[in-house]
């Protein structure tokens, strides 16, 4: 998915699921409507390994909706990273992981630096400002 607004809406819960997902033609499995491609899989196994989950899947349907891939710049992945860091703020704060929490805020600010220095896209700049603003509210 090359649409940051999808990630923003999911993380900040600012939209309904209406229009965000669509069903495939072959299986009643939803996928993100704006995805360039998607793979539908059958879950073969799911296990916890060292505090992480390991899923083994078998592809059952591959759909390519856009034949020409979109190009990326550093801003897009930096915003996605910032969203991931943002989702860790509450758990780190709750668990009183002070050192990790401080590092998390530093990483968020680094993501902001990357976005500001790699794009002039107004939408991307607004997204990173929103993430930082919300993060600082959580810190307070």
Segment roles from a protein language model:
Residues 1-38, 42-140:
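Basic, polyanion-binding surface patches
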